[in-house]
UniProtKB/Swiss-Prot annotation:
Segments for region (Disordered): 1-28, 156-202, 417-683, 793-816, 849-883, 1036-1228, 1243-1441
Keywords from the UniProt entry: Chromatin regulator, Chromosome, Methyltransferase, Nucleus, Phosphoprotein, Transcription, Transcription regulation, Transferase
Record-level Gene Ontology MF annotations: histone H3K36 methyltransferase activity; histone H3K9 methyltransferase activity; transcription corepressor activity
Native source species: Mus musculus
Acidic residues bias locations: 450-461, 479-501
EC number: 2.1.1.359, 2.1.1.367
Protein name: Histone-lysine N-methyltransferase SETD5
Inactivation phenotype: Mid-gestation lethality due to severe developmental delay such as vascular abnormalities in the embryo and placenta, reduced cellular proliferation and increased apoptosis. Defects are probably due to a widespread impairment in the regulation of gene expression. Setd5-haploinsufficient mice display altered neuronal network connectivity leading to autistic-like behaviors. Haploinsufficient Setd5 cortical neurons show reduced synaptic density and neuritic outgrowtho, with corresponding decreases in network activity and synchrony by electrophysiology.
Any Pfam family matching the protein: SET
SUPFAM superfamilies: SET domain (SSF82199)
Compositional bias annotation for Basic residues: 165-189, 611-621, 1062-1076
PROSITE patterns according to UniProt: SET
Length: 1441
C-alpha cells in the first residue's frame, strides 16, 4: 500500500531508539505514559491509557493508533521524537516533570520541541482536515487538547511536541470538520464506529496520519509479542510437535537472513533484498534491491505481533487503511497481525496489490512466530514488492490503495474505490440509531408523514380550531423533538409546513384535527417505543431534544397558557405519543412529565422561533451542559408535572378522547399545547404531549429558578439541624476555612483544604462519615459568605460568643446539643453564617489576634488583667463542668478553647475585666487552693500571676479558690479536654506533633496553650487541665513524652498519642509558603526565630513550650503547659500573659504578640509535615542557631536572658525586651513554682520532665527539630538527673536536648517564657527560649530552693535563672544559645537599656506576683512576673512574628 509520509523525513532508517528512552515508542509511552496517565488521571491521562491498555501488550501505542487512526501521540512521539531524529534527543534526557507535573525540558529538548511543533504545524495544516480524523477517534475527543498536552508533557520531552501537535490538529479538525463532524461528533462520543466514520471519511486526515506513521516509527530489530500470541504459540507448539523440529531450520533462517536483515535495517532493506523508495511525496514502497528469485526471503515483517482482535480492539482498523499493519491468519487459523505503525522495519512499507509478487509466510523460531515476506514470483530489481490484501478491503470505508499498475482497469480495488468514498457515508446509515444522518432521515420521514397527515386535515380546513391546530402543532413539535434525528433543517421545513398547516388547521374541522392528533399520538407512541429500543440513540436525541425543547419552551413562555397546559399535559402523556415530536426532547423525560396539554388556547407563535431555538440548542447541546441542566430541570418539572398530571388527567381524561390532530405538524407548533376549543382534543393532546408539555411551559430561566429555589430550600434544611460541634481538627479547619470572617484574616491558618478533603486519616469513623457531618458545615459559598457577613454585622450579638465558641469546639461526643441548643437561633442559620457573624464581632474586636487553634486568641491590648481570660474561663469552666467540657468550652473558656480551636472569637471575653475579676477569683481559688499545684497557679493562673499585678487582691483571693475550682474544673474538664483535645489536638494538624511529643507532655502542651492563654490572659480549663496534667499528668506526659502520642496528651488529649502521625501533610505550595514565612521571620532575628517556630509548624512553638515545659514544665504543669504551642494557654504562660496584660508593656507586648501571632498563626496553625519538618528542620534550626549564636555573641550566658528579653522586647519595645529578659528569668522563676511542684514530680520522674520536654519538642508547634531535641531533652533530663533540681535539671535537659537539634528547642524553651505571651512569642523566643528555659530552670531551681518572694527574689530568680541559663545555655545550649542568642543579641542590642528597665519591671512584677502568690515563692511569682514581662516582650515578639 502506498504510505503517506510526512515531509522532511527522508528515510525510515532513523532509529527510533532516539525517540523516547524506550526502544519502542509504544513501550515507552505504554508504560510511562500509562503509568503517568494513571498518576495524572486528573488530567484524563487515563483516557488515552484507557484505550491504550486494553490488554494489548503495547497498550498505549497500539490502542492509540487504533483509536486514533492516526499515529496518535505515541506514534507521533515515535515519529516526532525521531522526527527530531537529526536532533536525536536522548530518549531519557535530564528533562523531568516538575512537581507541578509539567515537563521541564532541557535546552535540547526545547529546541526539538519547537522544531517539532513547527514541523507538526506545517504538516498538520496539511493534515488538519483529516489527519486527525482517526486521531479524533473516541479517545482524542475524550481528551481535551490540554489533556493531551499533559499526557505528552508528562511522559517525554519529545512527547510535548507530539502532544502539542495532536492537540492542535484536534482543534483544527474540530473547527474545519465541525460542520459535518458535529453530528458525527455525537456519534463519536457515543460510538467509536462513528468517530471512525468521521476519520475514515476524511482521506486527508488519514493521509496525514499515514505520513506520520511512514516516517515516525521505531526500527524493530525483533518482534514484540503480545501475551496472547505467546500463549497461542506455546499451545501450538505443544499441540504440534511437528514444529519442534522446524525451529532449528527457522532459527537458521532467523539467524542468517533475518539477522542480516536486522543488521541492514536502515535506509534500505536488509540484505539489499528490498529497499524503501519514496514513490510519492508522502509514500514509500518496498522495492527489490536486486533480482529476487521465487521463494526468496525478502524481509521479515517486524513489529508488534498480536492477535487481530487485540489490534482491532476498537474495530477501527477497517474504517481506516492502516497501511503498516500486516494481518496473518495462516498460523493455526489464529488471526494475528503485526502492527508496524510505530514499531517496525522496512517491511512495513510493503503495499498490498491485487497482483502481489510476494506473500507472507510464518516461521517459528525460538518458539516465536516470524512473519516473513517471500517472493512468490521472480521479482526484478527495483520492482515493488507487494503482497496480497490481507484484509477485506471491500469492508473498508476508505479508499483502498492498490499497488498494481494504475493503468490496470481490472483492478478490483480500483473498481471498488469509487464507491469507497461513498462508503463512509453509508456506514453511518448502517448505524441508523446512532448516525446523525439517520436521525435526519427519520426526521424527514416524520416530516413527510406529518406533512401528509397535515395535508389530509388541511383538506378539511376549519378556521375555528386555529388554537387546536396550534395544539396539534405542539404535539407535532413534540414528535419532532421525540425524533432525535430530526434536524434543524427538518424543523425549519416543518416550521414552513407548520405555518401552512396553521392556516390549514384553521380550515380543518375539529374531527379531522382530533383524528390527526390521535394518529400522531399513536405514531409518537410507536416512535417512542422504537427509541426506547434504541436507548443510545435516545440518549443522544434526548439531549438534543431537550435543548431544543427548552428553547421551544422559551418561545412558548411568551404564551403562559401553553406552558400551563403543558404542565398539565403530563397526565395525558401516556395517551398521546404524538406530543413527543414537540416533546422529543422531553420524550424520555417527558414520560416523566406530561408534555403539552394545551388547556388554554394560545396564539400560535411564529413557527420560525421554535425551529431557530432548536438548532441552537442542538449546537449548544454539545458545547454546553445546558442539555444536562435541561435534563435535570425537566426531571424536576416531570415530577411537578406528575403532580399536576393528576389534576390534568382529571380534566384531560374528559377530553382525552382525541388528541389534537397529529396531522398538525407545525414544527412551529412550538410546544403550543392544544388549546383547541374541543376539551377532549385538548385533554388527549395534553395527555400525549404531557411529557413535552410540562417541560415546555417552563423556560430555562424558569426551570433554573425553580432549581435554585429547590436547592436553596434544601440548603436551608441543614440549618434547622442543631450544629454539631466537631473537634476533628480537619473538620474545624474546614469550617474555619469556610468561615467568611476568618477567611479575611491571615491570622487564621486553617488546615489546608486538601487535608480536610481527605478527612483526618486517624479518625476512620470520621473519615467514614462526611467531614462535614452536618448541613451546617456546608461549603462556603459567596452567597453564604455575603449573607453571613451582612447578617453577621447585624446579628453578631444574637448569641453569646462564648456559646458559639462552645458550639464550635464542643466535641460531638460532648454536650454539643446543650450548647448548640443555646445557639439554636444562630445554629439555625448555616454554620458559616453564625460563624461569620461571630467572627465579624471578633474581627471587629479582635480579628488581628491570632486565630489559629494553636495560637491563643491574643488578649486585647486594652485588656489589662489576664484575669479577664481567667474569669471568663472560670465561668466557662463551670459551664463546661456542667456541659461536660472543661473550661475550654465555656464561653470564656472558649476563649482559651477558641485559641486552641483556632477561634479568635473569645478574645474580648478573655479580656473582660469584670469576667476576669469574678472568674479569675474562681480559677485563682482553684489555683491557690492547690498549693501543691504551683504549676496550677502558674499554669492555670499565670493570669492570676499577672492578675496580682493588675488585681492583686482578687488574685490573692482567687488563688485558693482557683486551686479548688480549677481542680474541679480540671477534673470535669479533664475528661472533656481529654476528649476534646484528644480529638481536636490528637487529630488536629497543629497538635499532631505536639501530641506526639507531649502526649504525656499534654500538660506541657496545655502549658503551651496556657502561655497562649497568658497572652490571651485567660486560664482555660486547658490551663487548669494542663496544670493538673502537669502535676498528675506531667509524669504521665513525661513518661509518654517519649511517645509521639504524648504530645497529643499535652494537647490535653492523652488519648491522642496514637495519632502523632496526625501532622497534616502540607501541600507543596503551603510548605513553601511556610518556609518563606519562616525565612522572613528569621530575617527579623527574633521574629525570624518566631516565624521559624511557626514555620516549623508551631512545632517550634511547641518545642519552645516543650523547653519551657521541660525547663519548668517539669517543675510544674505551667512549665508543661508552655511546652505546647499552646503555651499561651498554659497557666504559667497565661500568667505571664496576664502579667503582660497587667503591665502596660506586657499588654502592649501582648497586643503586639497577638498581632504577630495572627501573622504567625497561619504558619502555626499549619503543622508542618514530617517532611516539611525535615526540610525545614535544617533551615529553621540553622536560623535559630544563627540567632542564638548572635544572641550568644552579644551575651554568651546572661545575654541569653537579655537576648531573650531583647528578643522578646524587640518585637515590642526596648521595654518589651527587658520585660522579656526579666520575664524569662521571671518565667523561670514563675515556672519554677509550677515547675517546682512539677519538678517535685519530676524529681520523682526526671524522665517525666525530659519526656514532657520531649513531648514539647515533639509538639508540632515546636517543629520536628524541636521534637528531636525534645527527645534528646528527655534523654538529657533523664541523664542529668537534674529533675530533682528542677532548674538545673530542666536547664541541663534543655541544654542537652537542645544542644543541636534543640537550638530551635532551646529557643523554644525561651519561647515558652517569651512564648508565654503568645504562641509566636515562643518563636521570637526561640533564640531566647534557650536562655529563657535555662533561666527558668535556674529560677525553678531557685524556686525549688526557697527564694525570697519579694522583688529581690525576682531579681535573684532572674539572676539565678540567668546564671543558670547562662551556664546551661553556654553548656548545653551553646548551639542553641548561639542560634537563639544571635537573635536575642540582635534584639538585645536595641533594647538593652529598655531590657534593663523592662527586666526590672518584670522583676517588680515578679515581686508583686510573689507578694500576691507568696505560697508560690517569689521565684514563682517572679517567673510569673518576669514571664508576663517576658510575655510583653514575647508578645511583642510574638506580635512581630
Amino acid at each position: 500500500m502506498s504510505i503517506a509520509i510526512p515531509l522532511g523525513v527522508t528515510t525510515p532508517d532513523t532509529s527510533y531508539s532516539d525517540m523516547a528512552a524506550g526502544s519502542d515508542p509504544e513501550s515507552v509511552e505504554a508504560s510511562p505514559a500509562v503509568n503517568e496517565k494513571s498518576v495524572y488521571s486528573t488530567h484524563n491521562y487515563g483516557t488515552t491509557q484507557r484505550h491504550g491498555c486494553r490488554g494489548l501488550p503495547y497498550a498505549t501505542i497500539i490502542p492509540r493508533s487504533d483509536l486514533n487512526g492516526l499515529p496518535s501521540p505515541v506514534e507521533e512521539r515515535c515519529g516526532d521524537s525521531p522526527n527530531s531524529e537529526g536532533e536525536t534527543v536522548p530518549t531519557w534526557c535530564p528533562c523531568g516533570l516538575s512537581q507541578d507535573g509539567f515537563l521541564l525540558n532541557c535546552d535540547k529538548c526545547r529546541g526539538m520541541s519547537r522544531g517539532k511543533v513547527i514541523r507538526l504545524h506545517r504538516r498538520k495544516q496539511d493534515n488538519i482536515s483529516g489527519g486527525d480524523s482517526s486521531a479524533t477517534e473516541s479517545w482524542d475527543e475524550e481528551l481535551s487538547p490540554s489533556t493531551v498536552l499533559y499526557t505528552a508533557t508528562q511522559h517525554t520531552p519529545t512527547s510535548i511536541t507530539l502532544t502539542v501537535r495532536r492537540t492542535k490538529p484536534k482543534k483544527r479538525k474540530k473547527s474545519p470538520e465541525k460542520g459535518r463532524a458535529a453530528p458525527k461528533t455525537k456519534k463519536i462520543k457515543n460510538s467509536p464506529s462513528e468517530a471512525q466514520n468521521l476519520d475514515e471519511n476524511t482521506t486527508e486526515g488519514w493521509e496525514n496520519r499515514i505520513r506520520l506513521w511512514t516516517d515516525q516509527y521505531e526500527e524493530a530489530f525483533t518482534n514484540q509479542y503480545s501475551a496472547d500470541v505467546q500463549n497461542a504459540l506455546e499451545q501450538h507448539l505443544h499441540s504440534n510437535k511437528e514444529f519442534v523440529g522446524k525451529p532449528a531450520i527457522l532459527d537458521t533462517i532467523n539467524k542468517t537472513e533475518l539477522a542480516c536483515n536486522n543488521t541492514v535495517i536502515g535506509s534500505q532493506m536488509q540484505l539489499q533484498l528490498g529497499r524503501v523508495t519514496r514513490v510519492q511525496k508522502h509514500r514509500k514502497i518496498l522495492r527489490a534491491a536486486r533480482d529476487l528469485a521465487l521463494d526468496t526471503l525478502i524481509i521479515e515483517y517486524r513489529g508488534k505481533v498480536m492477535l487481530r482482535q487485540q489490534f482491532e480492539v476498537n474495530g477501527h482498523f477497517f474504517k481506516k487503511p492502516y497501511p503498516f499493519v500486516l494481518f496473518y491468519s495462516k498460523f493455526n487459523g489464529v488471526e494475528m497481525c503485526v502492527d508496524a505503525r510505530t514499531f517496525g522495519n522496512d517491511a512495513r512499507f510493503i503495499r498490498r496489490s491485487c497482483t502481489p509478487n510476494a506473500e507472507v509466510r510464518h516461521m517459528i523460531a525460538d518458539g516465536m512466530i516470524h512473519l516473513c515476506i517471500y517472493a512468490v514470483s521472480a521479482i526484478t530489481k527495483d520492482a515493488e514488492v507487494t503482497i496480497a490484501f490481507d484484509y477485506e478491503y471491500s469492508n473498508c470505508n476508505y479508499k483502498v490503495d492498490c499497488a498494481c499498475h494504475k493503468g490496470n482497469r481490472n483492478c478490483p480495488i480500483q473498481k471498488r474505490n469509487p464507491n469507497a468514498a461513498e462508503l463512509p457515508l453509508p456506514p453511518p446509515p448502517s448505524f441508523p440509531t446512532i448516525g446523525a444522518e439517520t436521525r435526519r432521515r427519520k426526521a424527514r420521514r416524520k416530516e413527510l408523514e406529518l406533512e401528509q397527515q397535515n395535508e389530509v386535515p388541511e383538506e378539511n380546513p376549519d378556521p375555528q380550531p386555529q388554537e387546536v391546530p396550534e395544539k396539534v402543532t405542539v404535539s407535532n413539535e413534540h414528535e419532532e423533538v421525540d425524533n432525535p434525528e430530526e434536524k434543524p433543517e427538518e424543523e425549519e421545513k416543518e416550521e414552513a409546513t407548520d405555518d401552512q398547516e396553521n392556516s390549514a388547521h384553521s380550515r380543518r374541522t375539529r374531527e379531522d384535527r382530533k383524528v390527526e392528533a390521535i394518529m400522531h399520538a399513536f405514531e409518537s407512541l410507536e416512535k417512542r417505543k422504537k427509541r426506547r429500543d434504541q436507548p443510545v440513540e435516545q440518549s443522544s436525541s434526548d439531549i438534543e431534544i431537550t435543548t431544543s425543547s427548552s428553547e421551544i419552551v422559551v418561545g412558548e413562555e411568551t404564551k403562559t397558557a401553553a406552558p400551563e397546559s403543558e404542565v398539565s399535559s403530563p397526565v395525558s402523556n401516556v395517551a398521546i405519543p404524538s406530543t413527543p415530536q414537540s416533546t422529543g426532547v422531553n420524550t424520555r423525560r417527558s414520560s416523566h412529565a406530561g408534555d403539552v396539554a394545551a388547556e388554554k388556547p394560545i396564539p400560535k407563535p411564529p413557527p420560525a422561533k421554535p425551529s431557530r431555538p432548536r438548532p441552537k440548542s442542538r449546537i449548544s447541546r454539545y458545547r454546553t451542559s445546558s442539555a444536562q441542566r435541561l435534563k435535570r430541570q425537566k426531571q424536576a418539572i416531570a415530577q411537578q408535572a406528575e403532580l399536576s398530571q393528576a389534576a390534568l388527567e382529571e380534566g384531560g381524561s374528559n377530553n382525552s378522547v382525541t388528541p389534537p390532530e397529529a396531522g398538525n405538524t407545525d414544527s412551529s407548533g412550538e410546544n403550543r399545547q392544544l388549546t383547541g376549543s374541543d376539551p377532549t382534543v385538548i385533554s388527549v393532546t395534553g395527555s400525549h404531549v404531557n411529557r413535552a408539555a410540562s417541560k415546555y411551559p417552563k423556560t430555562k430561566k424558569y426551570l433554573v429558578t425553580e432549581w435554585l429555589n429547590d436547592k436553596a430550600e434544601k440548603q436551608e434544611c441543614p440549618v434547622e439541624c442543631p450544629l454539631r460541634i466537631t473537634t476533628d481538627p480537619t473538620v474545624l479547619a474546614t469550617t474555619l476555612n469556610m468561615l467568611p470572617g476568618l477567611i479575611h484574616s491571615p491570622l487564621i491558618c486553617t488546615t489546608p483544604k486538601h487535608y480536610i478533603r481527605f478527612g483526618s486519616p486517624f479518625m476512620p469513623e470520621r473519615r467514614r462519615r462526611p467531614l462535614l457531618p452536618d448541613g451546617t458545615f456546608s461549603s462556603c459559598k459567596k452567597r453564604w459568605i455575603k449573607q453571613a457577613l451582612e447578617e453577621g454585622m447585624t446579628q453578631t450579638s444574637s448569641v453569646p460568643q462564648e456559646t458559639r465558641t462552645q458550639h464550635l469546639y464542643q466535641s460531638n461526643e460532648t454536650s454539643n446539643s446543650s450548647s448548640i441548643c443555646k445557639d439554636n437561633a444562630d445554629l439555625l442559620s448555616p454554620l458559616k453564617k453564625w460563624k461569620s457573624r461571630y467572627l465579624m464581632e471578633q474581627n471587629i474586636t479582635k480579628l488581628l489576634q491570632p486565630l489559629s487553634p494553636v495560637t491563643p486568641p491574643p488578649p486585647s491590648s486594652g485588656s489589662k488583667s489576664p484575669q479577664l481570660t481567667t474569669p471568663g474561663q472560670t465561668h466557662p469552666g463551670e459551664e463546661e463542668c456542667r456541659n461536660g467540657y472543661s473550661l475550654m468550652f465555656s464561653p470564656i473558656t472558649s476563649l482559651t478553647t477558641a485559641s486552641r480551636s483556632n477561634t479568635p472569637l473569645q478574645f474580648e471575653l478573655c479580656h473582660r475585666k469584670d469576667l476576669d475579676l469574678t472568674k479569675v477569683g474562681f480559677p485563682d481559688s482553684s489555683t491557690h487552693s492547690c498549693a501543691d499545684r504551683p504549676s496550677l497557679l502558674n499554669c492555670n493562673h499565670p493570669d492570676l500571676a499577672s492578675h496580682p499585678s493588675v488585681v492583686p487582691t482578687s488574685e490573692a483571693g482567687f488563688p485558693s479558690r482557683s486551686g479548688d475550682g480549677p481542680q474541679t474544673l480540671l477534673r470535669n474538664s479533664d475528661q472533656a479536654f481529654r476528649t476534646e483535645f484528644n480529638l481536636m489536638y490528637a487529630y488536629s494538624p497543629l497538635n499532631a506533633m505536639p501530641r506526639a511529643d507531649g502526649l504525656y507532655r499534654g500538660s506541657p502542651l496545655v502549658g503551651d496553650r496556657k502561655p497562649l492563654h497568658l497572652d490571651g490572659g485567660y486560664c482555660s480549663p486547658a490551663e487548669g487541665f494542663s496544670s493538673r496534667y502537669e502535676h498528675g499528668f506531667m509524669k504521665d506526659l513525661s513518661r509518654g513524652s517519649m511517645s509521639p502520642g504524648g504530645e497529643r496528651t499535652c494537647e490535653g488529649v492523652p488519648s491522642a498519642p496514637q495519632n502523632p502521625p496526625q501532622r497534616k501533610k502540607v501541600s507543596l505550595l503551603e510548605y513553601r509558603k511556610r518556609k518563606q514565612e519562616a525565612k522572613e521571620n528569621s530575617g527579623g532575628g527574633n521574629d525570624s526565630s518566631q516565624s521559624k517556630s511557626k514555620s516549623s509548624g508551631a512545632g517550634q512553638g511547641s518545642s519552645n513550650s516543650v523547653s519551657d515545659t521541660g525547663a519548668h514544665g517539669v517543675q510544674g504543669s505551667s512549665a508543661g503547659t508552655p511546652s505546647s504551642p499552646h503555651k499561651k494557654f498554659s497557666p504559667s504562660h497565661s500568667s505571664a500573659s496576664h502579667l503582660e496584660a497587667v503591665s502596660p508593656s506586657d499588654s502592649r507586648g501582648t497586643s503586639s504578640s497577638h498581632c504577630r501571632p495572627q501573622e504567625n498563626i497561619s504558619s502555626r496553625w499549619m503543622v508542618p509535615t514530617s517532611v516539611e519538618r525535615l526540610r525545614e528542620g535544617g533551615s529553621i534550626p540553622k536560623v535559630l542557631r544563627s540567632s542564638v549564636r548572635v544572641a550568644q555573641k552579644g551575651e554568651p550566658s546572661p545575654t541569653w536572658e537579655s537576648n531573650i528579653t531583647e528578643k522578646e522586647s524587640d518585637p515590642a519595645d526596648g521595654e518589651g525586651p527587658e520585660p522579656l529578659s526579666s520575664a524569662l528569668s521571671k518565667g523561670a522563676t514563675v515556672y519554677s513554682p509550677s515547675r517546682y511542684s512539677y519538678q517535685l514530680l519530676q524529681c520523682d520522674s526526671p524522665r517525666t520532665e525530659s519526656q514532657s520536654l520531649l513531648q514539647q519538642s515533639s509538639s508540632p508547634f515546636r517543629g520536628h527539630p524541636t521534637q528531636s531535641p525534645g527527645y534528646s531533652y528527655r534523654t538529657t533530663a533523664l541523664r542529668p538527673g537534674n529533675p530533682p533540681s528542677h532548674g538545673s535539671s530542666e536547664s541541663s535537659l534543655s541544654s542537652t536536648s537542645y544542644p543541636s537539634p534543640a537550638h530551635p528547642v532551646s529557643t523554644d524553651s525561651l519561647a515558652p517564657f517569651t512564648g508565654t505571651p503568645g504562641y509566636y512569642s515562643s518563636q521570637p523566643h526561640s533564640g531566647n527560649s534557650t536562655g529563657s528555659n535555662l533561666p527558668r530552670r535556674s529560677c525553678s531551681s531557685s524556686a525549688a530552693s526557697p527564694t525570697p518572694q519579694g522583688p529581690s527574689d525576682s531579681p535573684t530568680s532572674d539572676s539565678v535563672s540567668q546564671s543558670s541559663t547562662g551556664t546551661l545555655s553556654s553548656t548545653s545550649f551553646p548551639q542553641n544559645s548561639r542560634s537563639s542568642l544571635p537573635s536575642d543579641l540582635r534584639t538585645i542590642s536595641l533594647p538593652n537599656a529598655g531590657q534593663s528597665a523592662a527586666y526590672q519591671a518584670s522583676r517588680v512584677s515578679a515581686v508583686s506576683n510573689s507578694q500576691h502568690y507568696p505560697h508560690r515563692g517569689s521565684g514563682g511569682v517572679h517567673q510569673y512576673r518576669l514571664q508576663p514581662l517576658q510575655g510583653s516582650g514575647v508578645k511583642t515578639q510574638t506580635g512581630l512574628s
